[in-house]
């Protein structure tokens, strides 16, 4: 995919109400220059997909083919090309989020659905069209601070990697470099206990990733309260693992609503650990 293809990619993606923008495809190309894919019938663009590699783990997303080309095997070309590309980058496990009705399609390529609590289960897409939140509790058990240059990035990257199962430094660094994005971290003593990120392109705010120690849900709550204080009256979307029932209850109390659910699927062994978490995005895991 090149810059001249962005218009087609955005238009096709948004036939599915994905709220994609040119900036989304620019960012994906920044992370993985060869990972934004276009499929052509001669000179006619007919499909798109994206993939990104994080060491041994890769992620596949933004996969859509024009309706008149579906059922003709062209989507398989995109998917197989993406998997082979990720393999060439050293990826051993490929993850994706799928509409449940597409599980059978992806299973033909070896992807398996994760549906148990130990592996974080399916994904719930939640949204809030007008965020409101009470002031933070100010608990003395832990502190929440906005991430800044004074913090050691390697500590954040290592904490995230222990959960995700691969080094996402290139993603986290790129997100932190954007002034409109927010990141908060929480420490218990001198130990990092959790962090949360939000992406704000100027319209819909995407909250994630969130990663917290599994034994400290209050850290996740406080991180989100602090973040939401900065997002009052904004429209927010986030992606919650279906086994996060305590976090789900917290979000429902804040006025978030469930939009729909997606199936989490892997080609290869999932390395994601159990924890309190929100996905970073649908196209990057």
Name these PLM-found stretches.
Residues 86-99, 231-242:
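Conserved GNAT acetyl-CoA-binding A-motif
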């Amino acid at each position: 995919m090149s810059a001249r293809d962005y218009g087609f990619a955005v238009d096709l993606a948004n036939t599915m109400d994905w709220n994609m923008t040119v900036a989304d495809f620019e960012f994906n190309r920044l992370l993985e220059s060869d990972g934004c894919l276009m499929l052509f019938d001669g000179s006619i663009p007919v499909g798109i997909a994206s993939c990104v590699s994080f060491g041994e783990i890769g992620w596949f997303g933004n996969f859509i083919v024009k309706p008149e080309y579906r059922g003709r095997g062209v989507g398989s070309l995109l998917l197989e090309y993406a998997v082979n590309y990720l393999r060439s980058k050293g990826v051993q496990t490929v993850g994706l989020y799928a509409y449940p009705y597409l599980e059978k399609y992806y299973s033909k390529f070896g992807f398996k659905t994760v549906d148990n609590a130990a592996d974080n289960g399916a994904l719930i897409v939640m949204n809030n069209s007008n965020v409101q939140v009470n002031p933070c509790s100010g608990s003395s058990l832990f502190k929440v601070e906005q991430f800044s240059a004074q913090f050691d990035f390697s500590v954040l990257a290592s904490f995230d990697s222990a959960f995700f199962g691969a080094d996402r430094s290139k993603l986290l660094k790129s997100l932190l470099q954007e002034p409109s994005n927010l990141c908060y971290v929480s420490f218990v003593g001198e130990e990092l206990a959790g962090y949360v990120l939000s992406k704000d392109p100027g319209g819909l705010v995407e909250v994630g990733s969130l990663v917290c120690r599994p034994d400290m849900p209050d850290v996740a709550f406080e991180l989100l309260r602090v973040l939401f204080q900065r997002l009052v009256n904004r429209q927010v979307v986030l992606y919650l693992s279906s086994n996060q029932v305590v976090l789900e209850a917290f979000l429902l109390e804040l006025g978030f609503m469930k939009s729909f659910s997606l199936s989490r699927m892997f080609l290869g062994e999932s390395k994601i650990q159990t924890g309190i978490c929100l996905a970073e995005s649908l196209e990057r895991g």
